[in-house]
Amino acid sequence: MSSSFGKIFRVSTFGESHGGAVGVILDGCPPKLKVDINLIQNELDRRRPGQSDITTPRNEEDKIEILSGIKEGFTLGTPIAMLVRNKDQRPGDYDNLEQVFRPSHADGTYHLKYGIQASSGGGRASARETIGRVAAGAVAKQLLKTFCNTEILSWVKRIHDIESDINKEKISLKQIDSNIVRCPDEKVSTEMIERIKELKRQGDSCGGVIECLVRNVPSGLGMPVFDKLEADLAKALMSLPATKGFEIGSGFSGTYLKGSEHNDAFIKSDDISKLRTTSNNSGGIQGGISNGENIEMKIAFKPTATIGKEQKTVNAEGKEVLMKAKGRHDPCVLPRAVPMVDAMVALVLADHLLLNHAQCDLINK
């Protein structure tokens, strides 16, 4: 079971949804990096449960504890251990599911592979595991901001069949966090919230799409063939719970264009290190390497699998049973998934930034 990610900037998460705590060990972070603990807490607050009436009612404070690696606001270059204690577990909600495979959950596949079933809150398959990723991602964000002024912004673009079409170049974090669904389009966000509430009343759920924009990306991040930047971003984002699709740049819509329409022409420049393009269908990455343009991505999330409707399924003996979930769950994961997307993008970019310096700093380019 893999719980680690990254080559130089490495994270290992631990803990279960209804265990004593969840957390992360972050190794490979450079020393003397100024880290604001409040910014880490702010990211955790953005993903915590119980923050609004369109999220799960599970009530967790998610207060971060720094156990090692940071002293007086600066990193030591040693492993950074961060912990969040679980305080509102209700494993009894899952007693009736002990030997039942919930539709579209990890129960069945975990049983097939490991011979065990983490029915209580989903165990490691729960989105609660992402607390460690978000905490480590908050450190990665500060590293990227300090050395590159890089800004990562993610927002909800679509909920069910309700979609926003806002000018992404002008989007700010303040706009994104101005409402509980985290869509910077004021009119559309109201419609999204009402749709989620409607489905919640029906005991149902919905999915959607999160869009991510990364500004001030250094050129040269990523490597050819197996360590392409977009490949690592895809793996990172598709490792998040409930993800079902990834696009970068023009994505699937680019297949409708001709080469003459899709190509991003370079602009004449006296400084080749600041090369720019007339368009950005590539999404800021060409040949697996960042070109200095904004990185633009979309990530698809499926409807929450746990719903309040009675469903047919089978138990561990293969017999058909009826089940109805009792646990506390999000009717839509997207509002809380926004900081998770930010975190995974930050972790990939921080890792590639350090890899690039390790490989190329001695080269006279």
Swiss-Prot record:
Its needed co-factors are: FMNH2
Q: What is its EC number?
A: 4.2.3.5
Q: Which reaction does it catalyse?
A: 5-O-(1-carboxyvinyl)-3-phosphoshikimate = chorismate + phosphate
The UniProt keyword set, sorted, is: Amino-acid biosynthesis, Aromatic amino acid biosynthesis, FAD, Flavoprotein, FMN, Lyase, NADP
Q: Which residues bind FMN?
A: R124, A125, S126, G287, K302, P303, T304, A305, T306, R328
UniProt keyword DNA repair, yes or no: no
The Gene Ontology biological process terms listed for this entry are:
amino acid biosynthetic process; aromatic amino acid family biosynthetic process; chorismate biosynthetic process
Which Pfam families does this chain map to? Answer: Chorismate_synt (PF01264)
Cellular component terms per the entry's GO annotation: cytosol
* Keyword match Phosphoprotein: no
Pathway per the UniProt entry? Metabolic intermediate biosynthesis; chorismate biosynthesis; chorismate from D-erythrose 4-phosphate and phosphoenolpyruvate: step 7/7
Could you give a GO molecular-function term held by this entry? FMN binding
Where is NADP(+) annotated to bind? R47
- EC primary class: lyase
The note on the cofactor says: Reduced FMN (FMNH(2)).
Protein family (similarity comment): Belongs to the chorismate synthase family.
Q: How does it assemble?
A: Homotetramer.
Q: Please describe what this protein does.
A: This reaction introduces a second double bond into the aromatic ring system.
Query: What is the name listed in the Swiss-Prot or TrEMBL entry for this protein?
Result: Chorismate synthase
What organism is recorded for this protein? Prochlorococcus marinus (strain AS9601)
Phylogenetic lineage: Bacteria, Bacillati, Cyanobacteriota, Cyanophyceae, Synechococcales
